[in-house]
């Protein structure tokens, strides 16, 4: 039976915890997954593509979107604005897709408040703060000051782990991929996603097998 609506999977956690790498596997395996492309005011990193990784806009344009109630959720992080379009999310849910968000703690709260029954959330982290810092250095996209800021922000994020449904400590990428895929498939199997009355009616319409006692 087809789902009557889609589901939401929220991924949060410190920058450098491996969310992007895990997402790549998720989208290879879950064919009807839809990545919610955020709008941001930050400068594009090398290799990032407009419309694929982010929608890049000016601060003025973003603030206009806030005024026009364009965003489902938005937040200011490290001096930059990030937000999610309402229209694109509603459209994907109507098509029965798994809508995947890579957003911060406040964004998770906003999504959970808007779609409490459809949302499954996962907090992804490294085993230690030191490993997080090492990954950020190896990534080579930020200077020391920015890395220090990201690690400091990670301390704040770690305090909110209890707000999430699942936690993945990303020690081993392959094992973490398996965990995330299991969670994603479970999210798509929630009872709330199905028209239960139609399911039961269809089940009842089938001929009931006779048992020895019914003869």
UniProtKB/Swiss-Prot annotation:
Source organism phylogeny: Bacteria, Pseudomonadati, Campylobacterota, Epsilonproteobacteria, Campylobacterales
Catalytic activity: GMP + ATP = GDP + ADP
Positions that bind ATP: 13-20
Superkingdom to which the source organism belongs: Bacteria
Keyword Isomerase part of the UniProt annotation: no
E.C. number(s) listed in UniProt: 2.7.4.8
Annotated protein name in UniProt: Guanylate kinase
UniProtKB keywords: ATP-binding, Cytoplasm, Kinase, Nucleotide-binding, Transferase
Family (UniProt): Belongs to the guanylate kinase family.
Location(s) in or outside the cell: Cytoplasm
Keyword Protein biosynthesis included in the entry's annotation: no
Pfam families recorded: Guanylate_kin (PF00625)
